[in-house]
Amino acid sequence: KRPKMVNSSQFAEMYNEAYRSSGEGKNFYDETALSKYASGEDPDLYPDVDWLDELYKDYAFSQRINLGVSGGGNIAKYYISGAFYNEGGMFKTDSMNEYDTSTYFRRYNFRSNVDVKLHRTTTLNVNLSSVFEKLNGSGSNSDTAGAGAGTIWKYAYICAPNAFPVRFSDGKFSGPSTNEGHNPYNLLTQSGYYERFWNNAQSLIGLTQDFSELITPGLTANVKLSFDAQNYNWIRRKKQVQTFTASKRDEEGNIIYTEGNVGQDNLDYSKGNTGYTTTYIEASVNYNRTFGKHSVGALFLYNQKQKNKTGVDKAEDALPYRHQGIAGRVTYAYYDRYFIEGNFGYNGSENFSPGHRFGFFPSVAAGWLVSNEKFWEPISHVIDMLKIKGSYGEVGNDQIGGNRRFIYNATVIDSGSYDFGKTAHTEKGLRVGDWANPNVGWERAKKMNAGVEISFFNALKIQADY
């Protein structure tokens, strides 16, 4: 709900009171001004503007539409869905504009999941999705993050109701007499427009093979390939409107104007875009099997990722970002009471020289489900679950240079100048920007965790970790 703002008559009365209290001993606004603010007979020289009412609607609409279809049989199953979301803004517009300054956000979603049974033991999964978004608004904002709503909101609240009219009666645009401040109506409706677009397309193809019949029960293999593409771009068509201030009327009753900001008829044009594509490959072999009271599991996984950026400024950012690694896990459980797990990761990063590119990161974990022990049965109706667990391992970080890549290479940049030769011709100088460090490698950290999980009456669960 919008707050109720004072009108010009109330503002002038309170301003006079504050002016007198400051030690001036007289009113800032004379009786003529107070009378005209109260009567509203000359809105050009004595305006009375509720800026919130001039800029904001009483309500805004939003719509959401979803549609989904699913089906299939023994061989193939599918699910397809689409969605549309539209959120209108609270700002008003000028119907005389030849461009759209209205504030709104729109999003379109699409998703398709298809599972195909290629063979009794072979399954193919194809998942596709895409999102498209558009944001529209005023061109008054100077950054790329939004459409000027914060700036307009600010001046709508700090602009006095008697500062100047929304617009003069002869059609001229009003504004402050100094460079400080803005007419919020001009910011909203006369400063051009801004459009921001964002889209993201994702695809994932997976193939799963069950080797339970061919080799041994519990053995499966999985291959995944994903491709993601994201793009963000914006355009701004911006202008500055010609503004005037009114000081008085001449003998014939015409307003005497003082020119404020110099305007322009054309719309400036600026744009920007960024984006990236990511390709990810993963292959894994899984084994899970139970032998009486013993349960064993194992996983071996290979992964590779490449990311390409667009709309970058630095040459090194235009090169692909690449990571590669393998991981493994072995698990064992006895009688659903005692658990042990070992993991390792062997990961490679392009940020380091070939001799330091890969790092090995092991970990181990163990747990005891005390509530599954026979001696726990007498109190199991009170404490139905108690588990003690702990883990220890190493983790690594390859982003140790901030935004810098290829730490093993030095960078050279322009720096200063020097005179050379008999004619003392000036040449540009060079210096090392970032020094090379061929011996740097993964940042390593040791992690330890000990914890307890407990459940009372099958209702209250508490978990504590250190």
PLM segments and residue spans:
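Membrane-proximal, glycine/serine-rich, low-complexity loop/turn segments characteristic
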Residues: 1-198, 212, 399-418
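Extracellular/periplasmic, surface-exposed regions of secreted and cell-surface proteins
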Residues: 59, 113-121, 127-132, 141, ...
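Active-site-proximal polar cores
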Residues: 243
